Curated annotation (Swiss-Prot):
The keyword Membrane applies. It is a multi-pass membrane protein. The chain crosses the membrane at residues 13-33, 43-63, 71-91. The lineage of its organism: Eukaryota, Rhodophyta, Bangiophyceae, Cyanidiales, Cyanidiaceae. Its main location: plastid. Pfam families: DUF2499 (PF10693). PANTHER family: NUCLEOLAR-LIKE PROTEIN-RELATED, YCF49-LIKE PROTEIN. This is Uncharacterized protein ycf49. Keywords: Chloroplast, Membrane, Plastid, Transmembrane, Transmembrane helix. InterPro entries: Uncharacterised_Ycf49. It is found in: Plastid, Chloroplast membrane. GO terms for cellular component: chloroplast membrane.
Length: 97
Protein backbone atom coordinates (compact mmCIF):
# COMPACT_ATOMS: atom_id res chain seq x y z
CA UNK A 1 0.00 0.00 0.00
CA UNK A 2 3.02 2.25 0.31
CA UNK A 3 3.78 2.32 -3.42
CA UNK A 4 1.81 5.57 -3.82
CA UNK A 5 1.93 8.78 -1.85
CA UNK A 6 -1.07 10.01 0.10
CA UNK A 7 -1.99 12.75 -2.44
CA UNK A 8 -1.88 10.18 -5.24
CA UNK A 9 -4.17 7.87 -3.27
CA UNK A 10 -6.46 10.83 -2.73
CA UNK A 11 -6.65 11.43 -6.48
CA UNK A 12 -7.38 7.74 -7.16
CA UNK A 13 -10.16 7.54 -4.56
CA UNK A 14 -11.73 10.88 -5.52
CA UNK A 15 -11.74 9.80 -9.17
CA UNK A 16 -13.66 6.63 -8.30
CA UNK A 17 -16.16 8.62 -6.26
CA UNK A 18 -16.47 11.10 -9.12
CA UNK A 19 -17.20 8.33 -11.63
CA UNK A 20 -19.92 6.87 -9.42
CA UNK A 21 -21.53 10.30 -8.96
CA UNK A 22 -21.40 11.04 -12.69
CA UNK A 23 -22.98 7.68 -13.51
CA UNK A 24 -25.88 8.52 -11.21
CA UNK A 25 -26.19 12.08 -12.57
CA UNK A 26 -26.33 10.84 -16.17
CA UNK A 27 -29.05 8.41 -15.19
CA UNK A 28 -31.06 11.18 -13.54
CA UNK A 29 -30.45 13.59 -16.43
CA UNK A 30 -31.68 11.12 -19.04
CA UNK A 31 -34.65 10.22 -16.83
CA UNK A 32 -35.86 13.79 -16.31
CA UNK A 33 -35.20 15.08 -19.84
CA UNK A 34 -36.69 12.13 -21.75
CA UNK A 35 -33.49 11.17 -23.51
CA UNK A 36 -33.86 7.72 -25.15
CA UNK A 37 -33.25 4.75 -22.87
CA UNK A 38 -30.77 3.24 -25.34
CA UNK A 39 -28.52 6.29 -24.92
CA UNK A 40 -28.82 6.03 -21.15
CA UNK A 41 -28.05 2.32 -21.09
CA UNK A 42 -25.04 2.46 -23.41
CA UNK A 43 -23.37 5.47 -21.85
CA UNK A 44 -23.80 4.10 -18.31
CA UNK A 45 -22.47 0.67 -19.29
CA UNK A 46 -19.40 2.30 -20.82
CA UNK A 47 -18.89 4.44 -17.75
CA UNK A 48 -19.12 1.38 -15.52
CA UNK A 49 -16.27 -0.15 -17.53
CA UNK A 50 -14.22 3.01 -16.93
CA UNK A 51 -15.08 2.81 -13.23
CA UNK A 52 -14.01 -0.84 -13.05
CA UNK A 53 -10.76 0.06 -14.77
CA UNK A 54 -10.03 2.63 -12.07
CA UNK A 55 -11.01 0.16 -9.37
CA UNK A 56 -8.56 -2.39 -10.80
CA UNK A 57 -5.82 0.25 -10.80
CA UNK A 58 -6.50 1.00 -7.12
CA UNK A 59 -6.42 -2.71 -6.24
CA UNK A 60 -3.13 -3.14 -8.11
CA UNK A 61 -1.54 -0.28 -6.19
CA UNK A 62 -3.08 -1.30 -2.86
CA UNK A 63 -1.19 -4.60 -2.99
CA UNK A 64 2.13 -2.85 -3.79
CA UNK A 65 2.09 -3.82 -7.48
CA UNK A 66 2.54 -7.48 -6.55
CA UNK A 67 3.67 -9.57 -9.53
CA UNK A 68 1.25 -12.36 -8.55
CA UNK A 69 -1.58 -9.94 -9.32
CA UNK A 70 -0.27 -8.99 -12.74
CA UNK A 71 -3.59 -10.08 -14.24
CA UNK A 72 -5.22 -7.07 -12.53
CA UNK A 73 -2.96 -4.72 -14.46
CA UNK A 74 -3.67 -6.56 -17.71
CA UNK A 75 -7.42 -6.49 -17.03
CA UNK A 76 -7.24 -2.77 -16.23
CA UNK A 77 -5.45 -2.06 -19.50
CA UNK A 78 -7.94 -4.19 -21.44
CA UNK A 79 -10.92 -2.46 -19.81
CA UNK A 80 -9.46 0.95 -20.58
CA UNK A 81 -8.80 0.05 -24.22
CA UNK A 82 -12.25 -1.54 -24.59
CA UNK A 83 -13.97 1.45 -23.01
CA UNK A 84 -12.07 4.02 -25.05
CA UNK A 85 -12.75 2.19 -28.33
CA UNK A 86 -16.46 1.69 -27.75
CA UNK A 87 -16.94 5.18 -26.30
CA UNK A 88 -15.42 6.63 -29.48
CA UNK A 89 -17.58 4.31 -31.60
CA UNK A 90 -20.70 5.26 -29.63
CA UNK A 91 -20.08 9.01 -29.85
CA UNK A 92 -19.30 8.87 -33.57
CA UNK A 93 -22.44 6.81 -34.26
CA UNK A 94 -24.56 9.15 -32.13
CA UNK A 95 -23.41 12.29 -33.95
CA UNK A 96 -23.30 10.71 -37.40
CA UNK A 97 -27.10 10.75 -37.80
Amino acid sequence: MYSLSLPTWNIHIVTLVEWSIVIRLIYLFTYFYDIPRSFNFLIIILMIFFFLSGLFACCWHFFNNNSILLWISVAQAALTAFSNFFFLLFISAYYHK
